[in-house]
Amino acid sequence: MAVKTLKDLLDEGVDGRHVIVRSDFNVPLNDDREITDKGRIIASLPTLKALSEGGAKVIVMAHLGRPKGEVNEKYSLAPVAEALSDELGQYVALAADVVGEDAHERANGLTEGDILLLENVRFDPRETSKDEAERTAFAQELAALAADNGAFVSDGFGVVHRAQTSVYDIAKLLPHYAGGLVETEISVLEKIAESPEAPYVVVLGGSKVSDKIGVIEALAAKADKIIVGGGMCYTFLAAQGHNVQQSLLQEEMKATCTDLLARFGDKIVLPVDLVAASEFNKDAEKQIVDLDSIPEGWMSLDIGPESVKNFGEVLSTAKTIFWNGPMGVFEFAAFSEGTRGIAQAIIDATAGNDAFSVVGGGDSAASVRVLGLNEDGFSHISTGGGASLEYLEGKELPGVAILAQ
């Protein structure tokens, strides 16, 4: 990827310069607005530290949730500013707005090494506008915060697949660089997209088949096996004629699954047993059942132990592994064993078979942390779920493509 990097910017010198950084702080919060997974914040620290230590006046942009272009306290970045201050060991101020009076005053008042976090960029409807003129106007207002001799660093890999103002349009207005996180993510994904060592095993979970069709099509030619679990497996099982009862089912995708099984049946590996639940509840009654024995009115919320064993055997011989999506409702302890078992099998293959393993962001990355698994047991945990999938599908990522211009 022929783009300028953070190292190039630091070599040019940042002392006294305003540097605007797009980070990805779209982190999960509980009802008390406490961050439940700091993974994305931790991943952003090296770039922010390097710029601060280089004497830059750092202005950070990010979004949280979907406030739909309106100021909404529920989506304020206040918890993020607090977490950044704790993790960096220095005060990170939060502007009261995005490009308003407070943001300008604070940006103008920065001294070398200071870090300012702008309020949620999605509080401004122009951030996600389909109208290029609106996005350009917003980008100009953001770029103005950098004054003369400013620079833009793209370090939010989880958003580079979106052509939005703070990711894409601003890069047209300032000298632009890939942050350390974006650079690492792209190099890892290039490795598995272009030259994966065989056997290459892809593990797909998550709720919707429709979200993963593109990646199955794209990877079927390269992968030796595609393991399918999670909510999406029930549409495949239904396509094979199994009665999945009240399990998550995309009826309109059954024909597509039938077609995929006809073409890639030798590669697609499905569960052989399930963990059925009486209702969608962490305290639901549960049973381990074979594929046609889900009690009437019940639903499956996880893959069963035989499936974990089968999938583990496939993974044990792999040299390259890409995992995106949990195997079940891991947030409920009673239905987390499938995800835990697969994650552990990937960790074991990484250590025992020297496999190159990538966790493709999103819920799979969250599950590793929620279940207390060893994050260092994987070769790489991506911060971008949708972005990593789109990259592997062969789609252009606007936020990366613009950096090459």
Curated annotation (Swiss-Prot):
Alphabetical list of PROSITE patterns matching this protein: PGLYCERATE_KINASE
MF term (GO), any: ADP binding
Localization: Cytoplasm
Gene Ontology CC terms: cytosol
Example GO BP: glycolytic process
Domain of life: Bacteria
Residues where ATP binds: 212, 331, 361-364
Pathway: Carbohydrate degradation; glycolysis; pyruvate from D-glyceraldehyde 3-phosphate: step 2/5
Broad EC category: transferase
Enzyme Commission number(s) of this protein: 2.7.2.3
SUPFAM superfamilies: Phosphoglycerate kinase
Residue numbers binding substrate: 24-26, 40, 63-66, 122, 162
HAMAP family on file: Phosphoglyc_kinase
Subunit structure: Monomer.
Protein name: Phosphoglycerate kinase
Gene: pgk
